[in-house]
Design a protein with these regions (language model features):
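Transmembrane beta-barrel domains of Gram-negative outer membranes and organellar outer membranes
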Residues: 1-211
Length: 211
């Protein structure tokens, strides 16, 4: 199996808030079953601290190497952030994501996701999509769009053009950095953000016959 360690950092360029999230994903018996956790550390308008954590289970329902792949994910949201400081919601929540990936050609793939997050008093719906040009085996150009709507009337729409590249090592370790620039459109017009991504992926167990 493969273990993945992911760090992301997002900052709104017009304001001081930012969020760093660390995610670690492990196989459960096979690569088809994945268990992960996400822990955010963030700065709100006045305070900094840990936000609400998440425990996630993902099932690869349709194989990742198929032309169309499907891996639904269910998450439990844990109120580890301070609600009074604006760092958390103060309640348990649940989240469902339905991501689909499709190979559109020899060098173009697309990812789509529909999600719903439920906590007391508000439900959030998300729809996202991206197109990725595999410019080379280790360099990709990405354009992503994400829409968010809440039952309290909040709306957001952001387009994220960016790039990512890979460093592959003989040991099986793969390091993937990425950067993107968020552009708010529609209800988010005028907003801008910076996004940084870094992942480390390696085998969970040594190959047979190796230490």
């Amino acid at each position: 199996g493969v273990v993945q360690h992911i760090g992301t950092w997002v900052r709104a360029l017009q304001r001081s808030p930012w969020v760093f999230t660390f995610t670690q994903e492990w196989p459960l018996g096979s690569q088809a079953h994945q268990l992960s956790y996400s822990i955010p550390f963030q700065r709100a308008s006045r305070y900094s601290g840990f936000g609400d954590a998440a425990i996630n289970y993902r099932y690869q329902l349709v194989a990742a190497d198929a032309r169309v792949a499907f891996a639904p994910r269910l998450s439990l949201l844990i109120p580890t952030g301070s609600e009074s400081r604006g760092l958390g919601n103060g309640n348990l929540g649940a989240q469902l994501n339905l991501p689909v990936s499709a190979t559109l050609g020899s060098s173009v793939v697309s990812h789509w996701n529909a999600g719903v997050t439920a906590i007391p008093d508000v439900t959030t719906y998300t729809i996202g999509g991206s197109v990725i040009w595999l410019a080379s085996p280790v360099f990709n150009i990405v354009c992503e769009a994400l829409w968010l709507g809440q039952t309290n009337g909040e709306r957001a729409l952001v387009v994220n053009p960016g790039v990512r590249w890979a460093h592959n090592f003989a040991s099986g370790l793969q390091i993937v950095p990425g950067v993107a620039y968020g552009i708010g459109v529609g209800p988010s017009r005028g907003e801008q953000s910076a996004f940084f991504y870094l992942s480390f992926e390696h085998r969970f167990q040594a190959e047979s016959g190796r230490e």
